[in-house]
Amino acid sequence: MNQDHPEFDSEDLSQNPPETDPLKAEIESLRSEIALVKADALRERADLENQRKRIARDVENARKFANEKLLGELLPVFDSLDAGLTAAGTEPSPLRDGLDMTYKQLLKVAADNGLTLLDPVGQPFNPDQHQAISQGEAEGVAPGHVVQVFQKGYLLNDRLLRPALVVVAKHD
């Protein structure tokens, strides 16, 4: 027993008074609630950051492919100019030179906007970029390689806009 204060016993100090047990329980409850709120805040912050990244990616894709419709509608024009150049032959003439300049200028403008021409003669057949319309025999061309292109294909910023229509060399 404590002599100055007989109401306090040293054994009593190790035991908690009855009113502190509910306080400890409330403190533990609040601590667990704080931990939950912190976890929720971290999760919300991560979700917000992921949403920002997704929006930035979507905006970048929208910018990269905004002219997809226009360039897609120009593909028949490229085809017509290419066919006109083929029909004009190789003899120089003012008409052929004008067609050639127009075709090259149009291709440059399209290339500046992300369009890439696929003209795969002699390359291995790539089902991601080529559409085989037939097989043919060709000397000097390895089997599975493109022998002829019926219609050129195009990529827009490395995404297929139109596959090249090709003839593939037969396997022996």
From Swiss-Prot:
Q: Which GO terms describe its molecular function?
A: adenyl-nucleotide exchange factor activity; protein homodimerization activity; protein-folding chaperone binding; unfolded protein binding
The record describes the protein's role as: Participates actively in the response to hyperosmotic and heat shock by preventing the aggregation of stress-denatured proteins, in association with DnaK and GrpE. It is the nucleotide exchange factor for DnaK and may function as a thermosensor. Unfolded proteins bind initially to DnaJ; upon interaction with the DnaJ-bound protein, DnaK hydrolyzes its bound ATP, resulting in the formation of a stable complex. GrpE releases ADP from DnaK; ATP binding to DnaK triggers the release of the substrate protein, thus completing the reaction cycle.
Entry GO CC: cytosol
Show the HAMAP family listed in the entry: GrpE
Q: Which family does it belong to?
A: Belongs to the GrpE family.
Question: Has keyword RNA-binding?
Answer: no
Q: What interactions and quaternary structure are annotated? A: Homodimer.
GO biological process terms, semicolon-separated: protein folding
Q: What is this protein called?
A: Protein GrpE
Record region (Disordered): 1-23
The protein's location, in the record's own words, is: Cytoplasm
Any stretches that span the bilayer, and where are they?
A: none
Q: Which PANTHER family match?
A: GRPE PROTEIN (PTHR21237), GRPE PROTEIN HOMOLOG, MITOCHONDRIAL (PTHR21237:SF23)
- Indicate where this protein is primarily found: cytoplasm
Q: Could you list this entry's UniProt keywords, alphabetically sorted.
A: Chaperone, Cytoplasm, Stress response
